[in-house]
C-alpha cells in the first residue's frame, strides 16, 4: 500500500553516483584504454595541421561500440589544445551524426548552421543544393585557417548523397569557382562499414586521398578494464559485487566486443538492484540484465543503428534460417527480402545490393557467412547465419517500426524451428516455391 502522505521521490540514489558515463554517446572519457596504436595513426594523420601543411582526410572504420567516436573526440580535443597553444588557426566542426541525413542538401545545411550564429540560421528548405554548398564555402572562408569537419556514421548517408558531398567538399579549395582561397579543409569520416570507401565512385575516391584507421572488437580483458573505468565513475563506492564487471565484460566479448553493450548491462543491473532496494549490485542482477539486454540491444539496432535496407536484410536472413530447410543462402535471403519489402510498402533493391547489405551486417557482427563448395555442380555459394538467437531477433523486429514486415505466421514457423533444433531433426530439402509459400505476408 502506498502512503499518500509520503513523497515516493524522497531520498537519494543508493546505487548510482551519476549515470551519464553509462550513456556512452553523451560522455567523453578522459582516459582511453587499449587504443594506443589507433591513436598513433590518428596523430600521424593530423600532424600536418600542426606543422603547417594541409589537413589530411581521415576515415575511421570498425563495428559499433569499439571506441571510434570516443578516440576521435579525444584526439580532436588534444589537437585543438595544441593548436591554441601554438597559435595555429583551427576550427573543428563535429562530430555530427549522419544517421538521419537523406540528402547532401540536408547535411550541408546543417554544416552551414554549425558555423553560423543562432540568429542567422539557414532554413531547412528554400535553396538549391548548389546554393547551400556555396553558403558552406563562404562560411569556411570566413573562419579561414585549418577547418576540420567530423562526420560520424557517414555510411548511413544514401550513396548518391554521399558521393555528391565527398566529391564536392575536398576539391573546394582547388575549385576556382568557390570563394575559398585562404582556408584549408580536412574531413574525418567515421563508419561502421569497413567497405565504405570501396563502394564510392572512382572519382570520389581519387578526390579524397584519405588515410584509413581500422578499429577491431575488444576482447574480454580489454572490456573489463574499460567497463571498470566507467563503473568506478557511475556507481557509488562499494555497491558493485566483484563478479559484476567481469561478467558484463565476458558477455559483451562473446557477443560483439562492444563497450556500449557492456555499459547497458551495467546500467540495467544497477536499475534492478535499485528497484529491489538492494544494498548493492550482484551477479544475479547482472545475469538478469544480460537476459533482457539482448532484445533491447537488437531493438536498438532495428530502430537506430541499421538503415531500413539493412534491417530488412537482417530480418530476411533470420526468416531464411528458421525455415524447414534451415539454409540461408544469398538467393533465399534475397527472395525473402523482396517479399517483406514489397509487402510492407518499402523499396526493393537489386539482388546485387544484397551482397553489400550482408557485408555491412557482417561488419557489425550481426551475421556471419560460410563458403560452400557445390562439388560436381561447380562453383561456390555462401550460407549465412545470424549471431543472435533468432527468437530474440524476431521479438525485437515485432517491437520495432519494422513489425509490418514480419510475416503473420512467424510464431508458428519459429515454434517448428525450435522443436527441430531440440530434437536435432533435419528437415528435407524444399524448393524455393515451397519455401516461399511458407510465409503469410499481409
From Swiss-Prot:
<dbReference type="InterPro" id="IPR049945">
    <property type="entry name" value="AAA_22"/>
</dbReference>
<dbReference type="InterPro" id="IPR027417">
    <property type="entry name" value="P-loop_NTPase"/>
</dbReference>
<keyword id="KW-0235">DNA replication</keyword>
<dbReference type="GO" id="GO:0016887">
    <property type="term" value="F:ATP hydrolysis activity"/>
</dbReference>
<dbReference type="InterPro" id="IPR050311">
    <property type="entry name" value="ORC1/CDC6"/>
</dbReference>
<dbReference type="GO" id="GO:0006260">
    <property type="term" value="P:DNA replication"/>
</dbReference>
<comment type="similarity">
    <text>Belongs to the CDC6/cdc18 family.</text>
</comment>
<dbReference type="InterPro" id="IPR015163">
    <property type="entry name" value="Cdc6_C"/>
</dbReference>
<feature type="binding site">
    <location>
        <begin position="66"/>
        <end position="70"/>
    </location>
    <ligand>
        <name>ATP</name>
    </ligand>
</feature>
<keyword id="KW-0547">Nucleotide-binding</keyword>
<dbReference type="Pfam" id="PF09079">
    <property type="entry name" value="Cdc6_C"/>
</dbReference>
<dbReference type="InterPro" id="IPR036388">
    <property type="entry name" value="WH-like_DNA-bd_sf"/>
</dbReference>
<dbReference type="InterPro" id="IPR014277">
    <property type="entry name" value="Orc1/Cdc6_arc"/>
</dbReference>
<dbReference type="GO" id="GO:0005524">
    <property type="term" value="F:ATP binding"/>
</dbReference>
<dbReference type="InterPro" id="IPR055237">
    <property type="entry name" value="Cdc6_lid"/>
</dbReference>
<dbReference type="Pfam" id="PF22703">
    <property type="entry name" value="Cdc6_lid"/>
</dbReference>
<dbReference type="Pfam" id="PF13401">
    <property type="entry name" value="AAA_22"/>
</dbReference>
<dbReference type="InterPro" id="IPR036390">
    <property type="entry name" value="WH_DNA-bd_sf"/>
</dbReference>
<keyword id="KW-0067">ATP-binding</keyword>
<protein>
    <recommendedName>
        <fullName>ORC1-type DNA replication protein 8</fullName>
    </recommendedName>
</protein>
<feature type="binding site">
    <location>
        <position position="218"/>
    </location>
    <ligand>
        <name>ATP</name>
    </ligand>
</feature>
<comment type="function">
    <text>Involved in regulation of DNA replication.</text>
</comment>
Amino acid at each position: 500500500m502506498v502512503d499518500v502522505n509520503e513523497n515516493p521521490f524522497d531520498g537519494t540514489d543508493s546505487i548510482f553516483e551519476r549515470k551519464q558515463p553509462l550513456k556512452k554517446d553523451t560522455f567523453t572519457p578522459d582516459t582511453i584504454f587499449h587504443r594506443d596504436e589507433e591513436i598513433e595513426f590518428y596523430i600521424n594523420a593530423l600532424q600536418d595541421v600542426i606543422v603547417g601543411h594541409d589537413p589530411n582526410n581521415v576515415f575511421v572504420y570498425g563495428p559499433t561500440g569499439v571506441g571510434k567516436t570516443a578516440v576521435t573526440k579525444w584526439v580532436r580535443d588534444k589537437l585543438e589544445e595544441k593548436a591554441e597553444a601554438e597559435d595555429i588557426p583551427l576550427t573543428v566542426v563535429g562530430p555530427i551524426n549522419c544517421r538521419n541525413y537523406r540528402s547532401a542538401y540536408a547535411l550541408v545545411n546543417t554544416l552551414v548552421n554549425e558555423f553560423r550564429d543562432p540568429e542567422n540560421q539557414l532554413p531547412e528548405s528554400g535553396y538549391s543544393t548548389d546554393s547551400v554548398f556555396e553558403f558552406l564555402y563562404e562560411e569556411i572562408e570566413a573562419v579561414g585557417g585549418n577547418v576540420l569537419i567530423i562526420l560520424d556514421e557517414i555510411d548511413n548517408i544514401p550513396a548518391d548523397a554521399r558521393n555528391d558531398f565527398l566529391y564536392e567538399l575536398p576539391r573546394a579549395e582547388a575549385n576556382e569557382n568557390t570563394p575559398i582561397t585562404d582556408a584549408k579543409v580536412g574531413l574525418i569520416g567515421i563508419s561502421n562499414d569497413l567497405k565504405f570507401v570501396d563502394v564510392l565512385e572512382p572519382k570520389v575516391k581519387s578526390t579524397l586521398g584519405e588515410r584509413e584507421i581500422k578499429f577491431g572488437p575488444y576482447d574480454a580483458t580489454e572490456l573489463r578494464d574499460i567497463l571498470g573505468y566507467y563503473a568506478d565513475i557511475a556507481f557509488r563506492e562499494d555497491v558493485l559485487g566483484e563478479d559484476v564487471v567481469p561478467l558484463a565484460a565476458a558477455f559483451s566479448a562473446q557477443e560483439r566486443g562492444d563497450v556500449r553493450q557492456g555499459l547497458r548491462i551495467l546500467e540495467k543491473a544497477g536499475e534492478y538492484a535499485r528497484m529491489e532496494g538492494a544494498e548493492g549490485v550482484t551477479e544475479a542482477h547482472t545475469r538478469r540484465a544480460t537476459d533482457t539486454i539482448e532484445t533491447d540491444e537488437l531493438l536498438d539496432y532495428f530502430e537506430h543503428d541499421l538503415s531500413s535496407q539493412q534491417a530488412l536484410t537482417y530480418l530476411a536472413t533470420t526468416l531464411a534460417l528458421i525455415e524447414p530447410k534451415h539454409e540461408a543462402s544469398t538467393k533465399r535471403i534475397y527472395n525473402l527480402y523482396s517479399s517483406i519489402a514489397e509487402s510492407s510498402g518499402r523499396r526493393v533493391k537489386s539482388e546485387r545490393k544484397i551482397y553489400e547489405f550482408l557485408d555491412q551486417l557482417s561488419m557489425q557482427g550481426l551475421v556471419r557467412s560460410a563458403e560452400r563448395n557445390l562439388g560436381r555442380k561447380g562453383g561456390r555459394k555462401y550460407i549465412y547465419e545470424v549471431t543472435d538467437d533468432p527468437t530474440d531477433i524476431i521479438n525485437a523486429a515485432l517491437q520495432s517500426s519494422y513489425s509490418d514486415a514480419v510475416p503473420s505466421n512467424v510464431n508458428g514457423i519459429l515454434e517448428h524451428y525450435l522443436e527441430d533444433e531440440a530434437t536435432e531433426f533435419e528437415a528435407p530439402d524444399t524448393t524455393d516455391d515451397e519455401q516461399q509459400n511458407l510465409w503469410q505476408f499481409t
